Amino acid sequence: MDLNLLKSWNPQLQKNRKKVYEAQQELLKSARKPADDGTSGGGLDWMYEGQPAPQRKVRKRRTRTRKPKQVPKDAQGKLQESLQTARSDAPEGTCSPDETAAARGGQQGAPVEVSAKSPAKAVAEARGGPGSSGVHGE
């Protein structure tokens, strides 16, 4: 650039604003151009441009291709019998929720004591501070 041009640069002049605007538009176009090419796949793709793509092995999900496990018929019969005896031995609906809680060690049906005092009053009375007697200045 010419030194005289730098000295006479005035941002208020229309021709100078136009030059700045055109330069900014040119920068924006050059920044958008690589994005339009579709080469923004990844950061390391430029390193592998000349090399052939690696071949991937086809993986099959085992759960879809695996056949169900074959159980011998005598083992299936024993399993069915044990399930039926377990179901028949269990009493149906004989235990109440209170009995099951008591068997676990809890007390589900025990009444809960509810205090009529507010928590703030209880704390004030425990401290012996103002508000415990209800009269200020005693």
Swiss-Prot record:
It is found in: Nucleus. Its main location: nucleus. One of its GO terms (biological process) is mRNA processing. It comes from the Eukaryota. Keywords: mRNA processing, mRNA splicing, Nucleus, Spliceosome. One of its GO terms (cellular component) is spliceosomal complex. InterPro entries: CIR_N_dom (IPR019339). Residues 128-138 have a biased composition (Gly residues). Signal peptide: none annotated. Pfam families: Cir_N. Residues 56-70 have a biased composition (Basic residues). Residues 28-138 are annotated as: Disordered. Involved in pre-mRNA splicing. Belongs to the CWC25 family. Associated with the spliceosome. This is Pre-mRNA-splicing factor CWC25. It comes from Eremothecium gossypii (strain ATCC 10895 / CBS 109.51 / FGSC 9923 / NRRL Y-1056) (Yeast). The gene is CWC25.
